[in-house]
């Protein structure tokens, strides 16, 4: 019986887009560039592309977080300290947590059926900070963050680490997440079934 649920965080149960949008607006205001707050979708596109590159092992996390703002500012034709602005954005993000609609009920339903482990490629400070802001860190039987493991989804080594340290037998696990490229592809590579759970709608290619 598959009753060990390996549950993704961002855009599966956590409303990352809301947290990110608010943090971006505050960072732009802090930098004296309030007019750019309305260009969040442009920043998001750059950020998403870099995270995909991270999943493929093409960039490091430390370079990604600064490069996203450097590219955004370059596209907007403005000069700014990308590292400083990222620091402001990230600091706000770490304390700004929201659940997606229905996430609390979904989490309770999973917990009633078995054990729930959070698996995420996010940064520890951002993930733990938002979970603590919501008061739900203790609702999980284990939390696995890529930066603490040394490998990121969809790398099979990420999942092997989870199986070994949960502890959870592979044959008892199922992955639930919103990303085809990290959650679903990672589950396939690790030899476990998966459920595409996308509250905002089924992504292209599903």
Task: Spell out what each predicted region is.
Residues 1-5, 17-18, 80, 104, ...:
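Asp-based, Mg2+/Mn2+-dependent phosphohydrolase catalytic module
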Residues 49-88:
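A metal-dependent, Asp-based hydrolase signature
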Residues 1-45, 74-75:
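Active-site neighborhood of HAD-like aspartate-dependent phosphohydrolases
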Residues 120:
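Conserved phosphate-coupling serine/threonine residues in phosphotransfer and NTP-handling enzymes
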Residues 62-66, 83-117, 156:
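Short, acidic loop-to-helix structural element flanking the phosphoryl-transfer center
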Residues 40-43, 66, 159:
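A general structural signal for well-ordered alpha-helical segments in protein cores
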Residues 21-25, 62, 66-70, 124:
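An amphipathic alpha-helix signature
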């Amino acid at each position: 019986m598959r009753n060990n649920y390996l549950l993704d965080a961002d855009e599966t149960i956590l409303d990352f887009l809301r947290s990110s949008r608010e943090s971006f607006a505050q960072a732009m205001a802090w930098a004296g560039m309030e007019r750019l707050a309305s260009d969040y979708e442009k920043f998001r596109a750059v950020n998403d592309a870099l995270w995909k590159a991270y999943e493929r092992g093409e960039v490091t996390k430390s370079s990604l977080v600064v490069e996203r703002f450097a590219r955004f500012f370059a596209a907007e034709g403005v000069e700014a300290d990308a590292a400083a602005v990222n620091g402001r954005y990230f600091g706000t993000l770490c304390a700004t947590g929201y659940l997606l609609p229905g996430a609390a009920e979904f989490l309770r339903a999973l917990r009633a059926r078995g054990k729930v482990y959070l698996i995420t490629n996010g940064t520890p400070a951002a993930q733990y900070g938002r979970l603590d802001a919501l008061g739900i860190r203790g609702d999980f039987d284990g939390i696995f963050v890529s930066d603490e493991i040394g490998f990121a989804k969809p790398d099979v080594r990420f999942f092997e680490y989870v199986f070994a340290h949960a502890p959870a037998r592979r044959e008892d696990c199922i992955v639930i997440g919103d990303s085809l490229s990290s959650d679903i592809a990672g589950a396939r590579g690790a030899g476990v079934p998966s459920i595409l759970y996308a509250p905002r709608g089924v992504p292209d290619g599903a």
